[in-house]
Amino acid sequence: VDRLVADASVDDYHALLLPGGTMNPDQLRMDRDAVRFVKDFMASGKSVASICHGPWTLVEADAVRGRRLTSWPSIRTDLRHAGAEVVADQEVVVDGQLVTSRGPSDLPAFCAAVVEQFARAHHPMPG
């Protein structure tokens, strides 16, 4: 989708995938519009998937408190401090609408879980 996040509406999307790596999440968590969009997406109950360092953006959006998830090892302390229950020994953790994974070596399991979760979330858009 080619749209600025400032112009994006949660209503226009079925699901959200937050990228991993260090640069993408670091840039997203510093962008006020991106953080607002992620916060609104989580509040909507729609499916969200995140891998590796991606949950940093969820932390910034105050969207991990009381959630079970996993991530790259170096950000697990950030997740715990934000109120998350971190699961370190699973390739993929599904907590309701949220799918998370640890990193690149878990991509096959993550992709399968995301496809399953996003397929369940597909509903016709109004209009």
Which residues does each predicted region cover?
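Active-site-adjacent pocket-lining segments in enzyme domains
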Residues: 1-127
